[in-house]
Amino acid sequence: MSNPVQSDKDRVVIFDTTLRDGEQCPGATMTFEEKLNIAAMLDDMGVDIIEAGFPIASDGDFEAVNEIAKRSKNAVICGLSRAGAKDIDRCAEAIRPAKRGRIHTFLSTSPVHMKYKLQMDPQQVFELVISSVTRARNHTDDVEWSSEDGTRTEFDFLCRCVEAAIKAGASTINIPDTVGYAVPEEYYDLFKRVRETVPNSDKAVFSVHCHNDLGMAVANSMAGVRAGARQIECTINGIGERAGNAALEEVVMAMRVRNDKLPFWNKIDTTQLTHASKVVSAATSFPVQYNKAIVGRNAFAHESGIHQDGMLKNAQTYEIMLPETVGVKQTSLVMGKHSGRHAFIHKLEEMGHKLSSNQVEDAFVRFKALADRKKQIYDEDIEALIDEGMVSAHDRIKLLSLSVIAGTRGPQRATMKLDIDGVTRIEESEGNGPVDAVFNCIKSLVPHEAKLELYQVHAVTEGTDAQAEVSVRLSQDGRSMTARAADPDTLVASAKAYLGALNKLVMKRQRDVAPGHGASAAAAS
């Protein structure tokens, strides 16, 4: 949160690009509803700027950015655009409903990008910088210009482009480490030199956008801020292209915990960080690694006897921040089959979930069903239950029942009943193992050519009655979708996860085809 002692010149603007750069991570595509939910969450937690998508990329992206712009409360809603007129105009149309909108236009400036990607010479690129920013500025006063592959751009040319972009009306200048090549000292020097060299640098806010290919995205981001940048572009959980982006939770807490060395502040409500991490993880079906800084399951866990002894005497011996500051509770209320609706609603609110009355009722019904099968229900069980409900609410293919016969002899056999666009279908299939039989059953019921890229299982909680959480990734025609599902029965969880990914593929293809040419769920190939 903001520190009243520190001045506005020390304030760092948080620019979240989870919905744009984060979604570009292979397999991390989110549904329309998931994007709206995440945007509202980011707005509530104090994110200054939400980059909601790339409007020209698809009708689905345009619709998501446009709807987020309509619903925004406090955050600036930003759309990404290439340097072409068509891109910029489409972006402007998408963000128009926002109380405050921004066009973020970019152009490659490094020699390798200009030669092989753009096939343009430096003068052509320079002129396009001016024309693109000028066109964007005609739509809105808030224009950000990015020099793609800025850290590999020749310094003099970079300064020339930055000066021209500011002169054309850009109010924010982003110099990204697009390929995660820079080291902190180098990135610090780059920002320092550019700000000292460009004569009109004081007329724009400088921004950092760091990728994590060498594991230095957060360190580079903080180096840029120390050199005068006042905007950090980041994502929840650090998701993004290739090795990802700087993680929002890490840059925010670095400034808060080490304010002695990083005397800057931001407006983020840090108590919402853990919840935000779980929401994004559920939407993308990308598990958060256990040892992930700030929001990982083990971030505040201590197993070593020496560490435990120190913690019991004084938590500060091994913890540099209080768990509560990032939304981690010290104790969890264990719920079970005797818990009522009121206690369940209280637990949802305590965990940070804001659901409609219909969503609460649906979740409570599934909670009671789970409680009949499991002795104790932990917070992690409820998170998995809510995640599954949010994802499956609009599924066209739904699991009604599953029966599997398995043993040491002969092929395993699965019998499955599905609801496909309102029509009930039943199929029986064999396989080399129970999971193979289940997936073969789905392929018989819903013919498709999707390739299974990932099948992963882990326990949500401890104990023999723990829920199994299964992750499945399917790819087809250049599209890759991941889904997760949890159930005390591993085979049921496997079927739900596979169907979840298949539903996402169907929905994605629907959005990609021309209006009036809907895709059939029963013929996903």
UniProtKB/Swiss-Prot annotation:
InterPro entries according to UniProt: 2-IPM_HCS-like (IPR050073), 2-isopropylmalate_synth_dimer (IPR013709), AIPM/Hcit_synth_CS (IPR002034), Aldolase_TIM (IPR013785), LeuA/HCS_post-cat (IPR054691), LeuA_allosteric_dom_sf (IPR036230), LeuA_bact_synth (IPR005671), PYR_CT (IPR000891)
Presence of keyword Protein transport: no
Cofactor(s) this protein cannot do without: Mn(2+)
Official protein name in the record: 2-isopropylmalate synthase
NCBIfam families the record matches: leuA_bact, PRK00915.1-3, PRK00915.1-4
Pathway(s) served: Amino-acid biosynthesis; L-leucine biosynthesis; L-leucine from 3-methyl-2-oxobutanoate: step 1/4
UniProt-listed Enzyme Commission number(s): 2.3.3.13
Keywords: Amino-acid biosynthesis, Branched-chain amino acid biosynthesis, Cytoplasm, Leucine biosynthesis, Manganese, Metal-binding, Transferase
Functional note: Catalyzes the condensation of the acetyl group of acetyl-CoA with 3-methyl-2-oxobutanoate (2-ketoisovalerate) to form 3-carboxy-3-hydroxy-4-methylpentanoate (2-isopropylmalate).
Subunit structure: Homodimer.
GO molecular function terms attached to this record: 2-isopropylmalate synthase activity; acetyl-CoA C-acetyltransferase activity; manganese ion binding
Major subcellular location class: cytoplasm
Reactions that this protein is recorded to catalyse: 3-methyl-2-oxobutanoate + acetyl-CoA + H2O = (2S)-2-isopropylmalate + CoA + H(+)
Compartments where found: Cytoplasm
Regulatory domain, as annotated region: 398-525
Domain of life, per lineage: Bacteria
Organism of derivation: Bradyrhizobium sp. (strain ORS 278)
Binding, Mn(2+): D21, H209, H211, N245
Gene Ontology process terms (BP): L-leucine biosynthetic process
